[in-house]
A protein has these predicted regions:
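Short, positively charged and aromatic/hydrophobic N-terminal segments
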Residues: 1-4, 8-9
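Conserved nucleotide-cofactor-binding alpha/beta core module
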Residues: 134-135
Length: 203
């Protein structure tokens, strides 16, 4: 089994291991290995995932996870444009239907909809490189009702170890797997290649 990404939650009574899955078979393997939370998503609203799943697959994964007594975490952490916000409620309704335990959120608009409509799943603040201080995390916990937060990968260990003294909600740290460039929808790499002509034939 190849593990794509794994995180741990601290400031809790015990360490919680969260892992992404790239197939239903890998979900089963991760559950057998003792992972506490399975992290998955679909193509429109989830970012930084090894693969995406259809609604039917998410339903199947939810059953597997809950039958094993574990928790399902679904990515809703995209930066939402207006057309995406217009489509978000049916997806959140679906997540409620399959009894999703947690969702990750990176956009304030999604927090607003979740709180307005009273969904039962818990929310985790996940804005990637933006999550760099304990007071910022506490703000999202107090004002938006986030139950946890995902810390930026760039935080130095010296700062990281001081955070629990101030944090009011648990935080997740990436312990294994690839990191990312934060979502912007700007074609940065292609612009770089075009500027440097890096793809041109060289003799």
């Amino acid at each position: 089994m190849i593990l794509e990404k794994c995180g741990i939650i601290f400031l809790m009574e015990k360490i919680v291991i969260t892992a992404t899955a790239e197939s239903i078979e890998q979900v089963e393997q991760l559950l057998e290995a003792g992972v506490d939370r399975i992290y998955v998503g679909e193509k429109d609203f989830g970012l930084r995932l090894p693969t995406t799943f259809s609604y039917d697959q998410l339903r199947e994964i939810a059953k597997l996870v809950h039958d094993a007594g574990k928790e399902l975490l679904v990515a809703v952490n995209a930066l939402m444009h207006q057309d995406m916000m217009d489509r978000i409620k049916p997806f959140l309704d679906f997540l409620e239907e399959i009894k999703t335990d947690y969702i990750t959120i990176g956009d304030a608009g999604v927090f607003y909809v979740v709180n307005r409509d009273g969904y039962s799943f818990k929310t985790i603040y996940d804005a990637s490189t933006m999550v760099t201080s304990s007071r910022q995390i506490n703000f999202w916990g107090q004002k938006a009702g986030a139950s946890e937060a995902v810390l930026a990968r760039e935080i130095p260990s010296a700062e990281l170890f001081k955070m629990p003294e101030i944090l009011e909600i648990p935080a997740e740290v990436l312990v294994y797997g690839a990191s990312v460039i934060h979502h912007s929808k700007r074609p940065l790499l292609q612009n770089y290649y075009n500027f440097t002509h890096i793809d041109d034939e060289k003799t």
